[in-house]
Every structure is written in C-alpha cells, then in structure tokens.
Regions:
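N-terminal beta-strand-loop-alpha-helix module at the start
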Residues: 1-58
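A glycine-rich helix N-cap at a beta->alpha junction
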Residues: 63-69, 119-122, 147-148
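Short phosphate-binding loop-to-helix
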Residues: 64-86
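Short glycine-rich or small-residue beta-strand-to-loop segments that form or flank ligand, phosphate
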Residues: 65, 91-96
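Short Gly/Thr/Asp-enriched flexible loops that form oxyanion-binding sites at enzyme active sites
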Residues: 101-112
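Short, acidic/small-residue loops that bind anionic groups at enzyme active sites
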Residues: 113-130
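Long, charged alpha-helical interface segments
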Residues: 128, 133-209
C-alpha cells in the first residue's frame, strides 16, 4: 500500500531535507495553505482538502474536497481521516508543526489518533522527527545529536533506554513530571528505546543547519 503524505501550512525552511523523506509512489494530500509549499517541495497533489480560509481555492483538475469553515475537525485531521477511509496505513506529516501552538499540539496528537487506529506515522519539521514509542523497540541512529522522550498520554511505565548518555531501566515518566529531555546517542552506537506500558513521544533532533 502507498504511504500518505499530509502537507500542512506551517513554515518549512528545510525543503531539501523534507524532500529526502518522499518516496516515488507517495500519495500527497495538501491541506489548505499547505499548497504554498507545493512548488518548493516539487510534489503534485493527489488530493487537496480545506475550507480555504487561509489560501485561495486553486483552479485545478486535481481532486479537491472543499470543507465548511464551521466544523469540528481541522483540515489536517480531516485529511488524516479521509486517508484512513481510503485504506492508507502509513503516514508522513510535514508542515504541521510550528507557528500557532494550538494547531501544533493538535497535530502532534494526530500521531496518537493514527496509532489508536493501528497506523504508522512520522512527523517531520525543520528541527526534528517525531513518532510514538510503545512496546516495540525503536532505534535512534547516531546521526541525531539529541533525542527526547515526552509523555503526552498519561503515565508510561517500563521505559528502557540503552546506547545513550543517560540510560534508563524500567523507568516511569508522567505527564506532570517530564525528565526525558535531551538525551544523547553514545558515539559509534545506536540508542534503543522501548516502553512496556503507555506511549511516549520520541523527538529526534536534526543537527543544526
């Protein structure tokens, strides 16, 4: 099955880096003012969605879903639901973090919504990759200078971190007390993270540009 790439309207400065994540057979959904990134990203839309309150409705033969301005879901959340309805199981989210904090938080929690539906999702912005970690082991290569684990769903237990500057064995992180910030992969190693109970947001920072 093809992967779905959802492109929002938040700022993107590192277009070259973002393009490196694209695959030839990706299905691209542009959300409203995410269309401003189309030329720089060099990816034609397979689907356009939005209420077009922040971008002019395009004159195009590409499939377009016009949404009402008054609605419960943001354009990005609608795009994710529509992609799931069409059978997509893997997602890449770009242009969805930064700028307005409310939209950024909603889009980070979109990772939770997708995971609850059994989908894989990765969020990429100018500074980092973000994904959720649960019982599966996730590897963090040395090319990421820092990484952080943030609890966004309550309490995470049985947290294990190896191959890093600050290892952890059977730890807990609560929403009210976050201590998993700015860990480092040891030179020549790959860090490995897993969680027995709950979910953690894994943020892998890119080297400074």
């Amino acid at each position: 099955m093809r992967r779905c790439v959802i492109i929002g309207g938040a700022e993107i400065r590192t277009y070259d880096r973002v393009r490196q994540y694209f695959r030839p057979d990706d299905f691209f959904i542009y959300c409203d003012c995410g269309l401003r990134h189309q030329k720089a990203l060099g990816a034609e839309p397979d689907l356009i969605v939005g209420d077009f309150d922040s971008h002019e409705k395009p004159e195009t033969d590409r499939e377009t879903i016009v949404l009402p301005v008054k609605k419960d879901d943001t354009d990005t959340v609608f795009a994710a639901k529509e992609a799931m309805r069409r059978g997509f199981d893997e997602f890449l989210l770009v242009g969805v973090s930064g700028g307005r904090l409310d939209h950024t938080l909603v889009n980070v929690y979109l990772l939770v919504m997708l995971r609850e539906q059994g989908k894989q999702a990765l969020l990429v912005d100018d500074y980092s990759e973000m994904e959720l970690v649960g019982a599966e082991k996730v590897e963090i290569p040395e090319r990421f200078p820092f990484y952080s684990l943030v609890n966004i769903t309550g309490t995470a237990r049985g947290i294990t971190e190896t191959g890093c500057k600050f290892p952890l064995d059977n730890g807990e992180i609560h929403c009210g007390y976050q201590y998993g910030t700015s860990n480092e992969v040891l030179p020549g190693q790959t860090a490995v993270v897993s969680v027995k109970e709950g979910l953690l947001l894994l943020i892998k920072d890119f080297p400074e540009v």
